[in-house]
């Protein structure tokens, strides 16, 4: 079983906790996200260099993901123009199911492999670009299919997941595993996995813009 889907022994009885204990437990568990990112710092640095090279060649940074992972990519991309004064086309976020899935969950979108390919083609991904696929569990068919198509187009391909030995790693030039472990609520990867992913994406965009 994937670690992100396992039950967390420290929160088995969180529903019985007093409010303050519940809050303290969630704060304590959130440190796992920071530790997971620290553990992947070498791969993150390699990815920053690859993304920076893509930007220097006149390429773009594209994030692609489903659900929370996709939303985090769109969020990071949307903050780049006001923060760094760059074109909205330089850093783009693509979410499975389209922009309406930013506001309304579509649980089947992550399994639509053909849509991943289509979205890469629709965004004219080429050899100048760097594409970051984000999948907490590491097996979203939409993301894996998109990364395969991006690699066919000659783009640099980076994968971000929160489990080891998962399908996404087989299609990446660089694979980043932020091993966040079991969530406070079983399988709710919007929590620690999402926090770790947001930190990583913040690092990608910020360090890249500083280097550019």
Q: Where do the language-model regions lie?
A:
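Glycine-rich phosphate-binding loops that contact phosphosugars or nucleotide phosphates
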Residues: 66-212
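A generic structural signal for well-ordered alpha-helical segments
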Residues: 54-55, 150
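A short, well-structured juxtamembrane/interface segment
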Residues: 39-54
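Glycine-centered short loops/turns at secondary-structure junctions
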Residues: 58-59, 154
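Short, basic, glycine/proline-bearing loop/turn elements
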Residues: 29-39, 105, 130-133
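Cofactor-/ligand-binding subdomain signature composed of acidic, glycine-rich
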Residues: 1-36
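Substrate-recognition element of Asp-dependent hydrolases with the DxDx(T/V) motif
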Residues: 61, 65
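Short, positively charged patches
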Residues: 6-9, 45-49, 60
